[in-house]
């Protein structure tokens, strides 16, 4: 509706101009690809959720994360030296988590995850591939939300399907297929369950805490534990009072059935469910590599590679126009009115967002207190 459209434009105004332009531009490019697919009668390019776009997005993800790790190689080497007590380590006195704790905690956590996978019947190479794709998505999502300014993103590709197809149908046993399908639904399909972007934003905010920044990690852990207990209680209470069958079809009904259906296809028809698209995968990787090289080599380059990562999916279909309008308003003010007017416009759009979410939050609280009898927005 009109109110939501205005709020989306306000959000897009706050996004860096090169990101908002990239989201709009690459969304239009994806629609051109879809038109080419229809004109050439290629079914895998004919719809927004076609296999071509899924594998192209995966290729872009792999290239983006590879470039990100390459650019951070010196910093990561300094973190490793610091964690191992070697000379030349990077100073972590202003970080919310010490580098030794972060590094060894990461190592122990990865080991525990791999051990859990193997214990429940997943082959070790497959477990490494599953965890690698999970972290690939986490890193991309964190960058899209915290650096790019986008508040949501959707990955099109299916994690167990990718591993199953690239392995020729030999990666998963029965238990491994079920585990991967369930985690693919929970960690890839449910964007609101991901903590990587929220954690990164919290770490950025911690810079204002000074010496107390190290209290952020225990505060985050306590917050997550409390949220898990509260939301688990709330979901179970609603399930037993209203009936779980009355829940939303998409999240509570369709997605669980889809997860078990994917696992069933891998188990019962391993050969028929193998469907790799190496060409689309390569196109996405090459395209993202070129974009990152242009971004790093040309100071004036106006398009951020993050736009390519976030230009497909359900939300992109509804955000492309607000992002274009937000970019147009921002660039127009910068060109015609100057920085002072731009700052005033920024405050105006922030006020719109705060007012919208404050009213929505108040209505939500009143609905909760009245058992849903208070009218919603």
Protein language model features and the residues they cover:
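Alpha-helical multipass membrane-protein architecture
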Residues: 1-377
